[in-house]
């Protein structure tokens, strides 16, 4: 990914973390590990082992329950105070391990601690792999609204290892498919065709390989847009398709109803419906968008507790 502020690589593979040389990315001897406490112990140990192989002179960590409530200034402050107490320097590297909430939080902390230190993401959810970990947007929630506080902070690298997807529930996988659908709808008819024919059972032989291919295509679409418009002055706004409604839905539900990917699914249907009413698309195109979202077990209607007037 080549942007005005920095260039970095996205690495893909299946169960490659354990043998990946961290020094290929950073020579930092001070590494701070931020991870989701809900991750399986085996996975956490695997990543800690990967970090320790680089023989850092200083290593510490911060674990938290990755939910929208904890994606906050308060959690950021706790991490920053720990970094200060342990005297982590400007040459430090933060390694994030978890879903989009974790990458957003870690990226935000990295952007403000000592006016900016390196961060590397190891995203573990499909949504984080195809969207949240790529592009440099970081943020935390205010008391009432999502992602109101943030900064742009491009990572030093992103390691996308599909082995972590195997422990995801169908609901969390579906949340990630919503972002792949979004990328297909805004940019790539061939990806739309692949989604139409895709078998979602990743435990079926060969399907994880096909999913890896979808992830590569999807991240490339996002990376290409980010390269053109890092700070969202023009074409990067296309990546917000479905998100204007989605963030409102999540806020109205106080982050206790639909997860982000599900809200994006509903948001894309809402945006498509608005496009239909404005004459920008026809009814056949609207039906195709809605049916594709349904295929991936995503909701297509506003939840009962979401009044349109509040959204």
Model-predicted regions and their roles:
Residues 80-97, 104-121:
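Non-catalytic interfacial helical region
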Residues 66-67, 97-99, 241-242:
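Glycine-rich beta-strand-to-loop/alpha-helix junction loops that act as flexible
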Residues 101-108, 129, 248:
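Short glycine/serine/threonine-rich phosphate/pyrophosphate-binding segments
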């Amino acid at each position: 990914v080549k942007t005005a502020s920095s260039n970095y690589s996205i690495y893909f593979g299946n169960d490659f973390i354990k043998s990946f040389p961290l020094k290929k990315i950073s020579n930092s001897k001070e590494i701070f590990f931020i991870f989701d406490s809900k991750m399986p112990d085996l996975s956490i140990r695997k990543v800690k082992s990967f970090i320790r192989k680089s023989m850092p002179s200083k290593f510490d960590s911060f674990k938290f329950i990755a939910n929208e409530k904890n994606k906050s200034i308060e959690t950021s402050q706790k991490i920053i105070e720990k970094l200060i107490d342990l005297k982590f320097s400007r040459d430090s590297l933060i390694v994030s391990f978890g879903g989009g909430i974790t990458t957003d939080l870690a990226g935000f902390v990295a952007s403000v601690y000592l006016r900016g230190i390196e961060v590397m993401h190891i995203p573990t959810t499909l949504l984080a792999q195809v969207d949240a970990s790529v592009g440099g947007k970081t943020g935390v929630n205010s008391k009432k609204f999502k992602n109101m506080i943030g900064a742009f902070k491009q990572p030093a690298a992103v390691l996308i290892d599909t082995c972590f997807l195997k422990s995801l529930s169908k609901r969390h996988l579906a949340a990630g498919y919503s972002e792949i659908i979004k990328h297909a709808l805004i940019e790539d008819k061939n990806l739309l065709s692949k989604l139409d024919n895709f078998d979602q059972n990743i435990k079926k032989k060969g399907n994880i390989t096909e999913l890896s291919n979808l992830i590569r295509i999807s991240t490339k679409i996002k990376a290409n847009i980010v390269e053109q418009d890092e700070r969202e002055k023009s074409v990067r706004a296309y990546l917000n398709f479905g998100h204007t409604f989605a963030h409102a839905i999540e806020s109205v539900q106080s982050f206790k109803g639909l997860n982000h990917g599900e809200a994006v699914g509903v948001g894309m249907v809402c945006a498509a419906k608005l496009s239909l009413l404005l004459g920008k698309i026809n009814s056949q195109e609207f039906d195709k968008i809605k049916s594709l979202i349904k295929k991936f077990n995503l909701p297509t209607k506003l939840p009962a507790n979401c009044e349109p007037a509040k959204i």
